[in-house]
Each structure stands twice: as C-alpha cells, then as structure tokens.
C-alpha cells in the first residue's frame, strides 16, 4: 500500500486534486507531487461576481474572488508542472447551493451552504469528474482525517482542533469516503501547510484564508435572498413568548435564533430571538434563558456509525462551538433525537447537528424547528 492506502506505487496512482486557488489545496497538490503521485488539478468555476449584482468594492477582505482564485490555481499547477482543468459548474452550484440557501431562509431556517456545497458539487459531482479523468482518488485540502475501520474507511476530526472541518463534512457518504483522501488532516497546524507551499515556491504560500460565504462576499445574506425572491422580506410582528406584540420587523430573513441586535426594541432587559414563525410571519423574542434547549430533533441524517440505535455521543450544533455530551436516539427513516446533558442556547433550525465519539465522526443531520419535535 502507498501513503494513500492504495495498492499501487505512487507513480501509477492518479490523484485528482480539487484546487480552489487557496494555500491548503495547493499544498496538497505539491505534497502529492513531491511523493511521486500522478497529480491532476481540477478547479470549479462556481460563481461569477460580475453577474451577482455586487460591486467588487463592497466585498469584505478575505472573501473569495472566483476569477483570481482560478488564476491562482492555474499558476500553482504551472509551478508544479501538473495538468490543470477548469470546469464550469455555475449552473449546478446555483441550483444545489445558492437556491437552496435562499429557500432555507424563506423557511425561517439558518442555512450552512458550505455543507451543501461539499455534499453536492464538490463530492458528488467533482468525484464523478475525478473518476472520468482516470483518478484513483480525489484529494482535497480539508482538515479532517480518513481512517481505516472494521466496516470501511471512517471520518475523523483533524489533528489540529483549531483547523478541524469535520462539521462541514458530516454528509459525506461511505462510498465517497472510499474514494476521498485528506492529506492535510494530520498536519499540526496551518504553519505546516504554509511551509509546504513555501518550500515549493508556490505563489499562494502567503495568501490569506477566505472567511465569508463565497457567493455572498459582501456579507449581506438578506440582499441575496431578496434578489432571488423579491417578496421574501415580508414585514411582520415582533412578539414576546406570551404573544404580546412588542414591535414590527422587516422580514424573517433578517433574523436567526439567538440574535439580539437589530430588533429595534429599546429599553427593558435584553431580548433575544427565540423562534421564527413562517406561518404567522412573527419573530418571537424572549430572555436568554428562553434560548435553552435540551432536546433536538434532527432530520436527513447521514449515518457513518454502527448498528446502535441509542448511544452516548458528543454533538456540535454550530461549527464554532465545542462538542457537548448527549444521548443520541436513532429513529425511523433518516431522523434522530438528541438529548443534551446540559442545555445549549441558540440552537437554530437549518444548522447542522453533528455526532462524535471521541475524534470519530458518526454522522449528523439538520436541526428541525421545535414545533416539529
């Protein structure tokens, strides 16, 4: 077996690398080339800022810029002397990621588009492209680990907790894991990745990480939803948990669970968004204690564990939060129930709930509104 757990010498192993133009995927291509693999780079054209209606000057620092990123990916491929292909996936990305993002907001949920992009465009579609190119594996720059297990490869967190991206990859299927490789998962930190890029004199060695959603580089999510659905921002009432009207709002798309700012309610104790009601158009506000949640209903579960139907786990309800201890009950179909040991605040429908045992990812799903509990 070679270093990618493939029964071939590296020189006979074709690895297709998903090259975004950033330092991580560029370092992956360089590392595999250095190890003697037959490396092919592929970059996806996903989003054209010129047709987005956003002025380039309005973009935040450290956001994606499709044209420059493609240019950077090609420059890296040229520096490494590897073939490089740019594929137009704009229509697929618009349908499966951008439109779903907007639709999730219309349902008064808070989306995580990076998960949908990984699940559909990057792993479903790009994986097919990699096979068409004769690849034995598809490698990406994600900070996660792929480990052999009794029932096949398992998904594990990245070695560096600060860089771990497993939350965004919970929807990866077993079949996809069989073909995927994550060479950066065992890296001690970003400095090690940048050192690889610098050693190979790659033009992106010092490039900053992108921070915002690539198709909303100005950070104005509501404006994007409104461009796609002009009637999305319907005004409505702001009420307390007893139903008393406290004020008015300019549309549910401007709010998420746990939000405090932007309510326009002066005076009194701090109030937080505790529920969004798409049926009535109401924003429900309450105290910080009203945000407490002990039981979470989860749908569209992707399961990577064993046959257990009830087990102790740790769960993440947002990518930036530490995993919290809980009891997981797998229900019929693709549903699950999570009972937390201690209340979590601001559990938002539409976000992912990801299940862990130690460093292993057991899967995850999408958080349902409490009314569906």
Swiss-Prot record:
Give the Enzyme Commission number: 2.8.1.13
Per the UniProt entry, the disulfide pairs are 117-214
EC primary class: transferase
One GO cellular component term: cytoplasm
User: What's its catalytic activity?
Assistant: S-sulfanyl-L-cysteinyl-[protein] + uridine(34) in tRNA + AH2 + ATP = 2-thiouridine(34) in tRNA + L-cysteinyl-[protein] + A + AMP + diphosphate + H(+)
Q: Which GO terms describe its molecular function?
A: ATP binding; tRNA binding; tRNA-uridine 2-sulfurtransferase activity
User: What does the entry give for GO biological process?
Assistant: tRNA wobble position uridine thiolation
Q: Does the keyword Heme apply?
A: no
Give the region (Interaction with tRNA) as residue ranges.
163-165
Xref: SUPFAM superfamilies: Adenine nucleotide alpha hydrolases-like (SSF52402)
Where in or outside the cell it occurs: the entry states: Cytoplasm
Ligand binding (ATP)? 18-25, 44, 141
Q: Where is this site: Interaction with tRNA?
A: 142, 351
The catalytic residues are 117, 214
Per UniProt, the keywords (alphabetical) are: ATP-binding, Cytoplasm, Disulfide bond, Nucleotide-binding, RNA-binding, Transferase, tRNA processing, tRNA-binding
Q: Per UniProt, what is one Pfam family of this protein? A: tRNA_Me_trans_M
Function per UniProt: Catalyzes the 2-thiolation of uridine at the wobble position (U34) of tRNA, leading to the formation of s(2)U34.
Similarity comment: Belongs to the MnmA/TRMU family.
**Would you tell me the protein name for this molecule?**
tRNA-specific 2-thiouridylase MnmA
Q: Which gene encodes it?
A: mnmA
């Amino acid at each position: 077996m070679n270093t990618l757990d493939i029964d071939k010498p590296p020189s006979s192993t074709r690895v297709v690398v998903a090259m975004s133009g950033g330092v991580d995927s560029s370092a992956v291509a360089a590392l595999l080339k250095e190890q003697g693999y037959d490396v092919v780079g592929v970059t996806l054209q996903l989003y054209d800022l010129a047709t987005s209606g956003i002025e380039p000057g309005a973009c935040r620092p450290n956001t994606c810029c499709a044209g420059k990123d493609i240019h950077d990916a090609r420059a890296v491929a040229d520096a490494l002397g590897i073939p490089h292909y740019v594929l137009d996936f704009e229509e697929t990305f618009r349908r499966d990621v951008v439109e779903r993002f907007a639709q999730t907001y219309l349902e008064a949920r808070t989306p995580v588009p990076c998960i949908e992009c990984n699940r559909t465009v990057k792993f479903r579609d790009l994986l097919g492209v990699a096979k068409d190119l004769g690849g034995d594996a598809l490698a990406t720059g994600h900070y996660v680990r792929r480990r052999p297990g009794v029932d096949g490869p398992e998904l594990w967190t990245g070695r560096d907790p600060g860089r771990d991206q497993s939350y965004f990859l919970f929807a990866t299927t077993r079949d996809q894991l069989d073909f995927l490789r994550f060479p950066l998962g065992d890296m001690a930190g970003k400095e090690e990745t940048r050192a690889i890029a610098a050693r190979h004199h790659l033009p992106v060695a010092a490039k900053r990480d992108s921070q915002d959603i690539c198709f909303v580089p100005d950070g104005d999510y509501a404006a994007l939803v409104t461009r796609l659905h002009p009637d999305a921002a319907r005004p409505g009432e702001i009420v307390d948990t007893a139903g008393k009207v406290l004020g008015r709002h300019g549309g549910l798309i401007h709010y998420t669970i746990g939000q405090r700012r932007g309510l326009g309610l002066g005076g009194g104790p701090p109030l937080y968004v505790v529920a969004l009601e798409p049926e009535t158009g109401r924003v429900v506000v309450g105290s910080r204690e009203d945000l407490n949640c002990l039981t979470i209903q989860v749908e569209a579960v992707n399961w990577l564990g064993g046959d257990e139907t009830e087990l102790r786990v740790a769960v993440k309800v947002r990518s930036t939060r530490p995993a919290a201890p809980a009891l997981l009950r797998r229900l019929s179909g693709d549903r699950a129930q999570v009972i937390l040991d201690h209340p979590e605040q601001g559990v938002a429908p539409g976000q992912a709930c990801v299940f862990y045992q130690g460093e292993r990812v057991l899967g995850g799903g999408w958080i349902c509104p409490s009314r569906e509990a």
